[in-house]
Amino acid sequence: MVKINIKSSTDNKFDVDVELGITVADFKKVIATKCSIPADQQRIIYSGRILKDHQTLDEIKIQDGHTVHLVKGAAPPPPPPVEQQVPTPSNTQPQGIPGVPQNINDMMNNPMIQEMFNSRMMDSLLDNPDIFRDMMMGNPEMREVLNNNPEMAQMLSDPRQLRQSLEMMRNPELMREMMRNADRAMINIENHPEGFNLLRRMYTDIQEPLMNAANQQAASQNQTNSNPIQTNTDANPNSQPLPNPWSTNSSSTSSNPTSSSPSSRPTTGSSTNTGASNPWASMFSGGGGGMGGGTNNTGTNNTGSTNNTGASNPWASMFGGGGGGMGGMGGMEGMLGMDPERVQQLLNNPVAQQMMQRLMSDPAMMQQMITMNPQLRQMMDSNPQLREAMNNPEFLNMMTNPENMNAMMQLQQAMGTLRNNGVFPGGMGGMGGMGGMGGMGGMGGMDFSQFGNMFGGMGGMGGMGNNNSSTTRPPVNQEPPEQRFRLQLEQLEELGFVDRAANISALTSTNGNINLAIDRLLR
């Protein structure tokens, strides 16, 4: 019988008396009697190595009075429920609704989806059944189902029912229990007098209309999204020069290529758009393709101007003006403030796309989102151009376009790479005399860090992703990781992790969480 000292990651210390012939699994059971960590979640570290359950204490050369470190690991996944095999019908049913995730568990385990359901914006949304019902009616599949089933429409009008459904969606264990109950009910459905009739009505009244509406929508989208390059190409080679992609009148230059010669090009060009103009066009208009917005773009022997009588460019004056400099360009690294892979998964979800477009097209919801986010409200008050842009329905629709958001994410990653490589040192507080640049017109006016903070506060779902949207975001800690994670580094070194660079990298990626950092180091 020897005495082993136990030191947990929470700085709790105690000792146990064990025999050296027992296994590590039995050793964990003894430890579980003196701490709150279950045996299956214990990670015991000795001499920088994690102990395996089948090893004995003799094998690892542990002796009387030695100290081992105890870390709480992740809980093991629950075993899949055992289901009875039911006879499969001869006619095969459709596999699922097009555009809807086939595995709802994977979608609900997405951290971004969980943050969305836990946000105050979702709570306020469920308190107003009218807005929620309007969002559901905006989906053609759900609209057909609700029109054919008044009882379901009445359920969507009850805030209590909606809140109970939300609580179930927030709790993965509760949802799994509900799905197990549904599986058991389906197995025993033949014992219910009206079981098969209920199942038939559920299929004919709910599933079949959803399938029909979704198939029609998917067919129409496939028809409209056909590749125009493939359908319009002919066998003859194209000898025409490619037009300038950054020019606002590229269509006219492509149709008449000779008009772009130096002898025939006018010194002053203007374009008037009486319809809904491209909000991004005037950002790149003017001589030399400047990013000035068409107001102060003075090139060499060429002056460009736009007169948008329709939906004008709300970002023109933000990026325009002579020589303000690229103020706050360092904030582009934190633009959107989220993991690009998770954002990509969210953008590819058609349900999330419809919800986002619905939120952004509702002025009342946009105003509520601005009111609940003090940081966004302050930006609106200090920047009239941004407020005008957020009130522009066409611009909001373009902002919710998955292609545009993917492009913004790629721009974020590119700016982060440039900053990591030292191209943009010190946050790029301003690039001084950038007003000329051969007619580029300057890029002053708007602080990109404000634009990034706005999307960081919105959290990816129109203000719904950030659970702390009602509080002001704390300032970023500028201390080096060695000082910021000093205590965590000492704990890792005591546990036997001597690679300081790897420890700093793990702590930085986990934001100082010692347990997650240990899991990352042990992979």
From Swiss-Prot:
Q: Which domain of life is it from?
A: Eukaryota
Q: Kindly indicate whether the keyword Repeat belongs to this entry.
A: yes
Q: Which cysteines are joined by disulfide bonds?
A: none
Compositional bias of type Gly residues: which residue ranges? 285-296
Record's Gene3D superfamilies? 1.10.260.100, DNA helicase RuvA subunit, C-terminal domain, Phosphatidylinositol 3-kinase Catalytic Subunit, Chain A, domain 1
List cellular component terms (GO). cytosol; phagocytic vesicle
Q: Which InterPro entries match?
A: STI1_HS-bd, UBA, UBA-like_sf, Ubiquilin, Ubiquitin-like_dom, Ubiquitin-like_domsf, Ubiquitin_dom
Which segments show compositional bias classed as Low complexity? 215-227, 245-278, 297-310
Q: Which residues cross the membrane?
A: none
Q: Where is this region: Disordered?
A: 70-99, 215-325
* A Pfam family it matches: ubiquitin
Q: Which SMART domains match?
A: STI1, UBA, UBQ
- The Polar residues compositionally biased stretches are 228-241
| Recorded GO MF terms | polyubiquitin modification-dependent protein binding
Q: Which PROSITE patterns match?
A: UBA, UBIQUITIN_2
Q: Which residues form the STI1 domain?
A: 100-135, 139-178, 339-380, 383-415
What does this protein do, in the record's words?
Stable protein which acts as an antagonist of nosA by repressing cellular differentiation after the tight-aggregate stage, when cells differentiate into two precursor cell types, prespore and prestalk cells, prior to the formation of fruiting bodies.
Against PANTHER family, the record matches this protein to: FI07626P-RELATED, UBIQUILIN
What is the protein name given in its UniProt record? Ubiquilin
